[in-house]
Design a protein with these regions (language model features):
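Structural signature of the two symmetry-related core transmembrane helices
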Residues: 96-111
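Intracellular juxtamembrane helix-capping segments at the cytosolic ends
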Residues: 133-146
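Hydrophobic core of transmembrane alpha-helices in multi-pass small-molecule transporters
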Residues: 40, 119-133
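Helix-to-loop junctions at the C-terminal end of transmembrane segments
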Residues: 81-93, 176-177
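C-terminal membrane-cytosol helix-exit motif in multi-pass small-molecule transporters
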Residues: 1-16, 195
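Extracytoplasmic gate region of multi-pass secondary transporters
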Residues: 30-82
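Juxtamembrane intracellular "pre-TM" segments in multi-pass secondary transporters
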Residues: 9-35
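A late C-terminal transmembrane helix in Major Facilitator Superfamily
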Residues: 145-181
Length: 195
């Protein structure tokens, strides 16, 4: 924050006219209904890998240290993916990047479930890079559709995302209790392909 402040403090601020909220209402359903459906399916992979990964690792015999490190590895790679995916989507298109992210991360999750121990860290790095990189692309997609009301569009998206994440977290947890985390992770990877 300090670096941004120091670099941007001398840039003049141009206030644009605020957009009308009435202009945003007709755009809500055509964008957010399909986005909510895709996000719901996509959340299965994201929730499985971020919320339940350490528990999954412990159930499969990993040490407590390795279980915690696996989440750190995934999240660390996700930061790099998030930083790169926004720029890539500007050049290659939002939908194509989201398609590739979804397919690659789902296949990598399946590979993670059935890989040898020595392959876990490389797979987690690539999986984190791909699976956690969709958020900036989705935010950019929302901003593309609401150029005059970006804050409202982002607020609707983030609220929807938080609510869906909470719901999917419960569903994956209940599935993990009922059929085991291995099966819940497997089905989460397949369900995320529906996005």
């Amino acid at each position: 924050s300090l670096i941004l402040f120091l670099r941007l403090r001398d840039i003049p601020v141009n206030m644009r006219a605020k957009g009308s909220l009435q202009s945003i209402v007709p755009k809500i359903r055509p964008l957010f209904l399909p986005l909510a459906i895709a996000l719901f399916f996509r959340m299965f992979l994201a929730v499985s890998m971020t919320t339940y990964l350490p528990i999954y690792m412990r159930f499969n015999g990993a040490s407590l240290w390795m279980a915690g490190a696996s989440l750190s590895i995934l999240e660390f790679a996700g930061v790099a993916g998030a930083l790169m995916s926004g720029s890539l989507s500007d050049r290659l298109g939002r939908k194509s990047i989201l398609l590739w992210i979804t397919v690659i991360s789902s296949l990598l999750m399946l590979a993670f479930l059935y890989s040898a121990d020595w392959m876990l860290i490389p797979i987690l790095l690539i999986l984190g890079f791909t699976s956690l990189s969709s958020a900036p692309v989705l935010l950019a997609l929302v901003q593309d559709h609401f150029p005059d009301n970006r804050a409202v569009g982002n607020g609707i998206y983030l609220t929807m995302s938080s609510l869906l994440r909470s719901l999917v977290m419960l569903l994956v947890g209940m599935a993990g209790d009922a059929i085991g985390l291995q099966s819940a992770f497997f089905w989460s990877a397949l369900i995320s392909l529906l996005a």
